[in-house]
Amino acid sequence: MEEKQILCVGLVVLDVISLVDKYPKEDSEIRCLSQRWQRGGNASNSCTVLSLLGAPCAFMGSMAPGHVAFLVADFRRRGVDVSQVAWQSKGDTPSSCCIINNSNGNRTIVLHDTSLPDVSATDFEKVDLTQFKWIHIEGRNASEQVKMLQRIDTHNTRQPPEQKIRVSVEVEKPQEELFQLFGYGDVVFVSKDVAKHLGFQSAEAALRGLYGRVRKGAVLVCAWAEEGADALGPDDKLFHSDAFPPPRVVDTLGAGDTFNASVIFSLSQGRSMQEALRFGCQVAGKKCGLQGFDGIV
């Protein structure tokens, strides 16, 4: 029987990436070392990583005329199923200008988040849930995404344990509307930015302070850059993995998406939370030593 897919729901962006010797001063002109187009967006990047790791995966997000040919071709080149894409007749596919500092790998992003509508609960109603073993949702239009998550919950109540879809949610941006998503999903990824916005100064403090927001039995995960990542589960056991920095950091764009995808992949393969956390940090660390995603495995 064909292996079920992992579905990632969220954003796809055209990233125009300029690699520079050092970050430019305002009102200056510099030459870049190189420039490339790259398919970006959190859910889109996570699909790239899942596919590179060997997982059958699909992307669901909104797309519109514009840079679509490049983006769709790149999804297909990576073996990512785009049959769930919500095609929009109005608006433009988002794009971003990304500047990567070659001296330290830091990335600065200027996003043109266009008027393109996000995937709606109505769009999600058309999805055949039986195709998927795991669905990951990048927090965006939370009120609609709650309806999507409730649909998955309803579907799962009618399934035997081995057929239930596992669900993960990413709360990355410090926006109040997104915080309702904490209450959904078997695995919830909360970002360092959100944790600091809510007053926490470490991953462990964030997990202990926010765990009361997640559903019974869920695992809350927080990556903290060079300090590694922590996870907290229902038995109050804290897991930790150190970071695995590369010999030289060259490109951190998409490192968080790489971490999330690697944790999801590992858990979907039946690994323990400790193993998944370590694997996520290892793959994300390797990615930081590479331009783009090729070579992470």
UniProtKB/Swiss-Prot annotation:
Involved pathway(s): Carbohydrate metabolism; fructose metabolism
Listed CDD domains: Ketohexokinase
Binding site for ATP: 107, 225-228, 254-257
Pfam families in alphabetical order: PfkB (PF00294)
GO BP: fructose metabolic process
Regulation: Requires potassium. Inhibition by ADP.
Binding site for beta-D-fructose: 15, 41-42, 45, 257
Sample GO molecular function, one term: ATP binding
EC number: 2.7.1.3
Reaction catalysis annotation: beta-D-fructose + ATP = beta-D-fructose 1-phosphate + ADP + H(+)
Alphabetized UniProt keyword annotations: ATP-binding, Carbohydrate metabolism, Kinase, Nucleotide-binding, Transferase
Task of the protein: Catalyzes the phosphorylation of the ketose sugar fructose to fructose-1-phosphate.
Subunit structure: Homodimer.
Similarity-based family: Belongs to the carbohydrate kinase PfkB family.
Name of the protein in its database record: Ketohexokinase
Provenance organism: Pongo abelii (Sumatran orangutan)
Taxonomic path: Eukaryota, Metazoa, Chordata, Craniata, Vertebrata
